[in-house]
């Protein structure tokens, strides 16, 4: 089955310096869900709840923290209150936040808390319900924290590099989460795979075709937009705040912002069960 990513031209259609993103959808709140306390997952709030995005992949080096920071930065840019819950013992999101503060680049509109285990995660989610958006950066291994993070999510975002090893790990993760969801008596959270560190040279190559065909065969939804391999993203995660605290005089920063905007719009649409109008050919 053909997939947009196979012929995607996101990089080639990046706007010029005058580009200004149309505001993200005005209401990111997910409709009320009433969930019973099952398997230690209390989720029975009435009223408005924050939208929860869980970034998960047990394989190290998949780019979870980059995706988490991009998500948080895009929502914060549109004036939503955001908190990143760093549930990874490596603390990469925490290091980014602390390094940014040390440089005087406090990530505007983004707070950060750490959650060392499943209990701390549960307490954090309940305590932070006044925020608009919660982004959970999960550990690089499959365990209780990742499971609980996924069961709570409006959307599970699974970063994946264009390689069959990475794709097979993503599929195993999804199947395990489906099993745990069934065991807990909870509906499976929506999820999307996003190709990370994507290179325009990957387009129309055999590895990309094989990975996309494999994920299609497994009925795994893949984002039409990918996060490109960019020095700008590496600079950002090294403690330079968000993309919107970097100089827009730099064309590479403008391109990264446009790329991030397109990705987050698609992920946001996925939480609502909709597909945005294609912007690439």
Residue ranges of predicted features:
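Inter-lobe coupling/hinge region of RecA-like P-loop helicase motors
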Residues: 235-257, 261
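Beta-strand-loop-alpha "switch" segments that mediate conformational coupling across diverse proteins
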Residues: 211-244
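Inter-motif core of Ras-like GTPase G domains
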Residues: 145-164
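G-domain G4 guanine-recognition motif of GTPases
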Residues: 161, 191-206, 226-236
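Conserved C-terminal guanine-recognition region of P-loop GTPase G domains, centered on the G4
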Residues: 170-185
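P-loop/Walker-type NTP enzyme "switch/lid" segment
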Residues: 45-48, 52-62, 69-136, 140-144, ...
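Extreme N-terminal, non-catalytic leader segments
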Residues: 2-54
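Conserved ATPase-coupling elements of RecA-like P-loop NTPase cores
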Residues: 95-96, 143-149, 167-170
């Amino acid at each position: 089955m053909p997939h947009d990513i196979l012929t995607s031209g996101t990089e080639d259609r990046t706007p010029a310096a005058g580009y200004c993103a149309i505001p993200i959808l005005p209401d990111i709140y997910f409709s009320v869900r009433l969930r019973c306390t099952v398997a230690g997952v209390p989720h029975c709030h009435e009223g408005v709840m924050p939208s929860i995005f869980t970034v998960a992949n047990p394989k190290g080096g998949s780019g979870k923290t980059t995706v988490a920071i991009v998500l948080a930065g895009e929502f914060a840019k549109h004036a939503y209150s955001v908190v990143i819950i760093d549930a990874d013992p490596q603390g990469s999101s925490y290091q980014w936040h602390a390094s940014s503060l040390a440089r005087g680049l406090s990530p505007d509109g983004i707070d950060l808390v750490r959650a060392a285990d499943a209990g701390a995660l549960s307490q954090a989610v309940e305590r932070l319900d006044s925020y608009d958006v919660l982004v959970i950066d999960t550990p690089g291994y499959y365990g209780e924290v990742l499971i609980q993070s996924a069961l709570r999510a409006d959307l599970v975002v699974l970063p994946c590099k264009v390689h069959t090893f990475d794709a097979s790990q993503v599929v195993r993760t999804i199947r395990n989460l489906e099993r745990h969801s069934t065991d807990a008596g909870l509906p499976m959270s929506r999820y999307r795979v996003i190709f990370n560190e994507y290179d325009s040279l990957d387009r129309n190559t055999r590895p990309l075709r094989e990975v996309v065909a494999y994920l299609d065969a497994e009925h795994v939804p893949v984002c039409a937009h990918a996060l490109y391999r960019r020095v700008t993203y590496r600079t950002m995660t090294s403690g330079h705040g968000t993309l919107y605290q970097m100089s827009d005089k730099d064309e590479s920063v403008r391109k990264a912002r446009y790329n991030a905007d397109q990705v987050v719009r698609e992920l946001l649409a996925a939480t609502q069960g909709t597909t945005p109008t294609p912007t690439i050919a």
